[in-house]
From Swiss-Prot:
Its cofactor is Zn(2+). One of its GO terms (biological process) is malonyl-CoA biosynthetic process. Acetyl-CoA carboxylase is a heterohexamer composed of biotin carboxyl carrier protein (AccB), biotin carboxylase (AccC) and two subunits each of ACCase subunit alpha (AccA) and ACCase subunit beta (AccD). GO terms for cellular component: acetyl-CoA carboxylase complex. This is Acetyl-coenzyme A carboxylase carboxyl transferase subunit beta. It is found in: Cytoplasm. A zinc finger (C4-type) spans 32-54. Pathway: Lipid metabolism; malonyl-CoA biosynthesis; malonyl-CoA from acetyl-CoA: step 1/1. Its main location: cytoplasm. Component of the acetyl coenzyme A carboxylase (ACC) complex. Biotin carboxylase (BC) catalyzes the carboxylation of biotin on its carrier protein (BCCP) and then the CO(2) group is transferred by the transcarboxylase to acetyl-CoA to form malonyl-CoA. The gene is accD.
């Protein structure tokens, strides 16, 4: 008995079962992917998905972006019915699209429409990286092109927020065609005197960065956004050199003249509102 009483203590502790752990409802908390601090999700939504601790800009949903920018109740969505097909009969493509539709409540990886920012009417497009990583297929190209053409016809500015991993490989050459299609629409719009503002968010890469995303009258970016065509590893293997640690970040692009300004997300509405108002005459402010 005494031997049992003074025996060596175990050097390990029991781990509580899953049932004994605190029951936290799914979606209640959100961890910052940069500093790893945990917040209530509603706090992050209120902060526009910017970490209060490290200022890291997390991806926003398309509709959260719209709510953060537009005058209350003024946004009208366009072309929601345009969706992706499967022209190459790519295996499992349709099921993946269906899964993303259910997850995001979006019909495609871009939302387009018009509304007012600081009482200025604009045509608008916002890409959502939660849907197929914002990859550009024929449906996204068509929706963006239509939005640009509507801006030209109505003589209003066009503003786009990009977030994309590039062209959608499941659609092959049809996805690559969207680079030329959207870029030509931008050229026609700008030739007619239209104002285009592009805001590149994390990430803006591949065919999107090499087409409409980087040819606005103003090209802005959010802090820390990854902006580039090919990936770092591919470039390093090709040129056989080590790239700078900040290569392809928004700040790197600003330093090298590829973007005009890096704008904090919480300053975006005010900055765009002032810029749009500066460019518009009194007739368009009614």
């Amino acid at each position: 008995m005494l031997k049992d009483l003074f025996g060596k203590r175990k050097k390990y502790a029991s781990i509580p079962s899953e049932k004994a752990k605190m029951d936290v409802p799914e979606g209640l908390m959100q961890k910052c992917s940069n500093c790893k601090k945990i917040y209530y999700r509603k706090e992050m939504v209120k902060a526009l998905q910017v970490c209060p601790n490290c200022d890291y800009h997390h991806p926003m949903t398309a509709w959260d972006r719209i709510d953060s920018l537009f005058d209350n109740g003024t946004f009208e969505e366009w072309d929601k019915e345009i969706t992706s097909a499967n022209p190459l009969d790519f295996p499992e493509y349709e099921s993946k699209i269906a899964k993303d539709r259910e997850k995001t409540s979006l019909s495609e990886g871009v939302v387009t429409g018009k509304g007012k920012v600081n009482n200025v009417q604009i045509a608008f497009a916002v890409m959502d990286s939660h849907f197929r990583m914002g990859s550009m297929g024929s449906a996204i190209g068509e929706k963006i092109t239509r939005a640009i053409e509507a801006a030209r016809e109505e003589s209003i500015p066009f503003v786009i927020f990009t977030a994309s991993g590039g062209a959608r490989m499941q659609e092959g050459v049809l996805s690559l065609m969207q680079m030329a299609k959207t870029s030509f629409a931008v050229k026609r719009f700008r030739d007619s005197g239209g104002l285009m503002i592009s805001v590149m968010t994390h990430p803006t890469t591949g065919g999107v960065s090499a087409s409409f995303a980087s040819i606005g009258d103003y090209n802005f970016a959010e802090p820390g956004a990854l902006i580039g065509f090919a990936g770092r590893r591919i470039i390093e293997q090709t040129i056989r050199e080590k790239l700078p640690s900040d290569f392809q970040t928004a700040e790197f692009q600003l330093h090298h003249g590829q973007v005009d300004k890096v704008i904090h997300r919480q300053d975006m509405n005010d900055t765009l509102g002032k810029l749009l108002k500066m460019h518009m005459d009194g007739r368009q402010l009614k």
